[in-house]
From Swiss-Prot:
Coarse class of the protein's main subcellular location: cytoplasm
Functional summary from the UniProt entry: Specifically dimethylates two adjacent adenosines (A1518 and A1519) in the loop of a conserved hairpin near the 3'-end of 16S rRNA in the 30S particle. May play a critical role in biogenesis of 30S subunits.
UniProt-listed Enzyme Commission number(s): 2.1.1.182
Protein family per UniProt: Belongs to the class I-like SAM-binding methyltransferase superfamily. rRNA adenine N(6)-methyltransferase family. RsmA subfamily.
Cellular component GO terms, alphabetical: cytosol
Binding site for S-adenosyl-L-methionine: 11, 13, 38, 59, 84, 109
Protein name from the UniProt record: Ribosomal RNA small subunit methyltransferase A
One Gene Ontology term of the molecular function aspect: 16S rRNA (adenine(1518)-N(6)/adenine(1519)-N(6))-dimethyltransferase activity
Length: 270
């Protein structure tokens, strides 16, 4: 097994249980065309290849790419791209290999330090969702981030990230993956989480306004919502709206669920 490199935040997943849970979460079919981000040593890649039509793997580390080519290069449904997933245009890079496109599912064990930009790359933002979207995304990420993504209103983990991700996708927490499942063990635990991108045709009428509201609403968690939003919405008008949807005028941002945020945005963006 190659030695993990700190500069790439590499931690090799070695738990058979975790690998199997990732594969089960992906609900694979023989017609699936996968994108795997950061295949590393190929431990998951080898299990995925027999189950799908094709797999494009993107790996930044040149040395790992050489090892992957040596071990998996003869697989006719495997395409390896060397580069930074945040900078690569997969469709352009793989256009001469039509059987690998379009990608319909993503599986990734991603470095913790690029979780946010990876989510932007795969799902987009409220104001600019990724189109066309994937059918399913399976990520192994930091447990704390996964808990924030699936958090419910009023809980300590509920925040802007929760609302944004739940707006863009149906998010499902699959399982915990303890730090001992990796070599070397990271400092924190991980979790497997899935995203099924939503159809957004009947959501916010002004997504950019909704995104602005959410960011402002959570800019000071201890303040009441009407104080955080006063630069956009008159306090009295907001109080009137909150009363109409059976919320106290002293509510904070974390008390509103996704549908209430959408209703708030649609009402005041007219």
């Amino acid at each position: 097994m190659p030695q993990p490199r700190k500069r790439f935040a590499q931690h090799w997943l070695r738990s058979e249980t975790a690998l199997e849970q990732i594969i089960q979460a992906a609900n694979l079919k023989k017609s699936d065309r996968l994108l795997e981000i950061g295949p590393g040593t190929g431990i998951l890649t080898r299990r995925l290849l027999p189950l799908v039509q094709s797999l494009i793997a993107v790996e930044l580390d040149w040395d790992l790419c050489k090892k992957l080519v040596k071990s998996l290069g003869d697989e006719d449904n495997f395409l390896l791209l060397q580069g930074d997933i945040l900078k690569l245009d997969i469709a352009t890079e793989a256009q001469q290999f039509p059987k690998f496109l379009p990608i319909n599912k993503v599986v990734a064990n991603i470095p913790y330090n690029i979780t946010s930009p990876i989510l932007d790359k795969l799902l987009g933002r409220i104001s600019s969702p990724k189109q066309p979207s994937y059918d399913l995304i399976v990520l192994l990420i930091q447990k704390e981030v996964a808990q924030r993504i699936i958090a419910y209103p009023g809980s300590k983990n509920y925040g802007a990230l929760s609302i944004k991700m739940q707006y863009l996708a149906d998010c499902n927490y699959i399982c915990d993956v303890p730090k001992k499942s990796f070599y070397p063990p990271p400092k924190v635990d991980s979790a497997v989480i899935t995203f099924r991108p939503r159809s957004l045709l009947n959501s916010a009428t002004n997504p950019k306004y909704l995104e602005t509201l959410i960011n402002l609403g959570f800019s000071s968690r201890r303040k009441m919502l009407r104080n955080n939003l006063q630069s956009l919405i008159d306090r009295d008008l907001l109080t009137e709206f909150l009363t109409e949807i059976d919320l106290n005028e002293q509510v904070r941002a974390e008390n509103l669920d996704l549908n209430q945020w959408i209703a708030l945005s649609n009402y005041f963006s007219q």
